[in-house]
Amino acid sequence: MKISILSLFPELYETWIKHSIISNAIKNNQVIIEVIDFRLYTNDKHKKVDDYQYGGGAGMVLRIEPIVAAIRAIRSSNSYVILTTPKGQVFNQELANNFVSKYDHIIIIAGHYEGFDERINYYIDAQYSIGDFVLTGGELPSMVISDAVIRLLDGVISPSSLETESFNNYLLDYPVYTRPLVFEGHKVPDILLSGHHKNIADFRKQQQETITKKNRPDLYQKYLNNKK
C-alpha cells in the first residue's frame, strides 16, 4: 500500500510518521507514505496557492491548478483520490476496510483556508469527513484516515487484536483491566479472575452490547439488524 498526502504543511506529519506502529509499518515495507507540498506545483511566481472568492465572501479559496497538477504527477491506474472536507461522507471502519481490500494507492488531499475551488470534484473520486465538526485544516483528518487504513494492513497489528476491537461486528470494545486488583475501592470484576474462558467471553460480549447500546444506539441498531 502507498499513501500520498498533498498538503501545504508537510512538516506537521513528521512526528506521526516517525513513531510507533506507523514507523514500524514503514520500516517493514508494509506501507509507503509520501507527503507532498502541493505549493511546489504552482506556476505563481510568489508561490501563492489561494485566491479570493468569486461572488465575494469570507476566507481565501485554494486554487485548482496546483492541486490538479500534483494529482496528475503522482496518480496511477489504481489510485483512489480523496479530499478531506466537512462536507464529505463520514469516514468509518467499514470504509477503512474497503480501502485496504480495493486500493494499492490512496491519494489524500488535505484542505486549508476556506476550502477548495469546487471544480476539484472533477479530478477526485470522493470526499470524506471525520465527523460533524470543523478543523483548521485537513492535516489531522488525513492522518486519521491513513492511520485507520494502515493498521489494517497484513502484519501491522496482530489479527487477534483486530478481531476484538471497537466496530468489529458493529460493537464497541469491551472494558479491560490490569493490576492492581483493587484501586481506591474499585475492584476488577470477579469473573475475569475465574479462569473460565467461556464465561469470560460471554461477559465481555454482554459488556460490548451494553456499552454500544448506551453510547452508540445507531451502531447498536446495525448490530441487531446484522444478527437477523
Curated annotation (Swiss-Prot):
GO biological process: tRNA N1-guanine methylation
GO MF: tRNA (guanine(37)-N1)-methyltransferase activity
Sites where the protein binds S-adenosyl-L-methionine: 111, 130-135
Enzyme Commission code: 2.1.1.228
Reactions performed catalytically: guanosine(37) in tRNA + S-adenosyl-L-methionine = N(1)-methylguanosine(37) in tRNA + S-adenosyl-L-homocysteine + H(+)
KW Transferase (keyword) present: yes
UniProt cross-references to NCBIfam families, sorted A to Z: PRK00026.1 (NF000648), trmD (TIGR00088)
Protein name per Swiss-Prot or TrEMBL: tRNA (guanine-N(1)-)-methyltransferase
Taxonomy of the source species: Bacteria, Bacillati, Mycoplasmatota, Mycoplasmoidales, Mycoplasmoidaceae
